[in-house]
């Protein structure tokens, strides 16, 4: 019988999921995206060539792999076609490998306009969204007024629904935000043109996933963003609009939770965050600048500089709990090379000296300070190391300490951006 493995981020996103998914896809028949939208940015480096994916599962670069965009993904038809064409220009036969759920909620131009208008109105209190319409599209889904990919395949149905929802959103845009309205005919014409290109890729993805499982094939479920951005369990309201945790796998793909065999949590050897929101271990000194520069910490989707800080074991323990993480993959270990001392946050303390657990909302983070334990660094390079025995002693001690703090084994260690620069202690599909 095949295995179903979930790969997701356990921090605030940007943990290096794309590389790990690409690596593990060698052992999978199918790769499934189950939430998020084109606000994600998964960077792959294969033989020195860099590819950034936003919607299409990272397994697309491997031959004979089926890639599925499940019903939990909010889909921008325009962004998807741009990504397909970009990959095809590199010689990747995307259309024969990609399958799309007809239940995907659509991101249309008015969602983007609303997203950007809201962020503008918030001023300094902005959430820090990518401005790509993700939140408004999920809102329409929950409000039961959203258009779905299946609607695009039927012109009259799509036009009727579009007219109704556009009246509503144009009222908000013009009367509340004082912005120009979105043109109905332009949205309709653009959608219908793309619909014919997407039609051959649309299918019953729930049955496809279950048929793959019944055939004894391995399936990899690829998460986007990170667990601490989860709409329910993250640092609310500085979160994304979907469930980025393991529970979202079932609702976003149609696979039952009892069929999930292993959850691999991806975490950097330090911590980063893009945009606004709590970040207890954030650094504003030369160490923070070192991590940002050596780690090339700029968002793959927005290009925004990432905030950097020490490893937060408290936050990771929380992520382990809410995901039932089976094992961890530690990425960007090489960024810590050359540091004399490395700090790990092992607890939170309130201003009155009380040790506390993870706050449930962003306000709770305003009254805590991190408790650190200092560990010795290493001067040797870990870049490209492929065996655990070849790592510096202090690097191995650091890895062991993180395992002790989180209570979860570190099964994979990434020592560089290329898929080959990896130490695999346990392959979720094979061991």
Swiss-Prot record:
Pfam families on file: Adenylsucc_synt
Functional note: Plays an important role in the de novo pathway of purine nucleotide biosynthesis. Catalyzes the first committed step in the biosynthesis of AMP from IMP.
The keyword Magnesium is annotated on this UniProt entry: yes
Family named by the database record: Belongs to the adenylosuccinate synthetase family.
Subcellular location(s) of the protein: Cytoplasm
Xref: NCBIfam families: PRK01117.1, purA
Organism expressing this protein natively: Chromohalobacter salexigens (strain ATCC BAA-138 / DSM 3043 / CIP 106854 / NCIMB 13768 / 1H11)
Binding annotation for substrate: 300-306
Any single biological process term in GO: IMP metabolic process
Sites where the protein binds Mg(2+): 14, 41
The protein's required cofactors: Mg(2+)
Binding site for IMP: 14-17, 39-42, 130, 144, 225, 240, 304
Keywords for the protein's UniProt record, in alphabetical order: Cytoplasm, GTP-binding, Ligase, Magnesium, Metal-binding, Nucleotide-binding, Purine biosynthesis
Record note on quaternary structure: Homodimer.
E.C. number(s) listed in UniProt: 6.3.4.4
Active site: 14, 42
GO cellular component, one term: cytoplasm
Entry protein name: Adenylosuccinate synthetase
Amino-acid positions noted as binding GTP in the UniProt annotation, renumbered to this chain: 13-19, 41-43, 306, 332-334, 414-416
Cofactor info, note text: Binds 1 Mg(2+) ion per subunit.
Highest taxon in the source lineage: Bacteria
Entry GO MF terms: adenylosuccinate synthase activity; GTP binding; magnesium ion binding
Pathway(s) served: Purine metabolism; AMP biosynthesis via de novo pathway; AMP from IMP: step 1/2
Reactions mediated catalytically: IMP + L-aspartate + GTP = N(6)-(1,2-dicarboxyethyl)-AMP + GDP + phosphate + 2 H(+)
